[in-house]
Amino acid sequence: NTSLHEGEPALMTAARTGKPGAVKALLSHGAKVNAKGRKSQTALMWAAADGHLEVVTLLLKAGADIRATLDSGFTPLFFAVREGRTEVVHTLLKAGIDVNEPVSREKNRKLKSGTTPLTLAVENGHFELATTLLEAGADPNDMRAGYTSLHMLSWVRKPDGGDGDDDLAPPTGSGIMSSAQFAKQLVDHGARVNTRLKGGKLHWKGATPFFLASKTADAPLMRVLLELGADPLIHNAENSTPLMVATGIGQTMEAASAGTETEILEAAQMLLDLGVDIDGVNNSGETAMHGAAYKNLPKVVLFLDDNNAKIEVWNRRNKKGSTPYLIAAGYRPGNFKPSYET
């Protein structure tokens, strides 16, 4: 039970490095199976995170606490899920862990309250593991985090940008299952494809998975969701249409949101073909043309005009007093330069 100077017991070191022989020897000589390191990690947490299945099995047989929890809210199962350790997850579930047990907000402010093993697997791109969780009874319609796993696919596939280019990349994940294939798995396991968000930012309240896929101009995902029964005409709570959010409503920073202008044009054409009203006006007095102005998309402006968007509808001030022209000219909240081409 001697600890290294970092506070790590010898058993934890053996578990972390995947040494079953050393683990057996230490346990047989009285090592405390639930001893904690300096940051309260246990040997089982380390073995689970690093995917050392044989060590995990040895520790469980020796009485390791499968529900040991860090201040972050992470248990051995959450460590295994985050790292995509499918075999370890199988073993922990067989040991009696509830597949739908969420991380509590009190213990982890970094994770969304209500995060479950399923949503954590989806967030990290482990779609085969997520399917394993579905087969073990994970609820595909769980909304304790504020959204379902089907909603999540839109931002997992095409994350909004941040300060660096790395923020634009989807998670590397594990396995060979694609996110589109996983969407079908979700529906096969009972996911409701037209579930609407109950809260969140104003522009996303009431959004369906298809609505959010439109927001990121993800035409391939939009097609998959349509095949699975998505209704493309469902508005959000603000009465915005999928076309409005595809062109830019609710996304006031050009570089910070997913979707290139080419992708937006493809999504917009698809939405018009599906019967979405090009002249829709939301509760804030905004139209698809306002969206194109917010995102500085001159080709989308021309596209809307070519498809007979009525100037008498879109050339009006929204509730903040801005027409699409004024928005493009930089007269909007924030430090925006005029987009002369728009």
Residue map of PLM features:
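Ankyrin-repeat junction/capping positions
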Residues: 1, 34, 67, 100, ...
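Ankyrin repeat boundary/linker residues
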Residues: 4, 37, 70, 103, ...
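Start-of-repeat signature of ankyrin repeats
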Residues: 7, 40, 73, 106, ...
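Ankyrin repeat A-helix N-terminal signature
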Residues: 13-19, 46-52, 79-85, 112-113, ...
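Conserved ankyrin/ankyrin-like repeat signature
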Residues: 21-22, 54-55, 87-88, 128-129, ...
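Ankyrin repeat domain, specifically the short helix-to-loop turn at the C-terminus of the second helix
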Residues: 24-32, 57-65, 90-98, 131-139, ...
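Acidic/polar low-complexity surface segments
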Residues: 100-113, 146, 150-161, 194-205, ...
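Leucine-rich solenoid repeat scaffolds
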Residues: 314-342
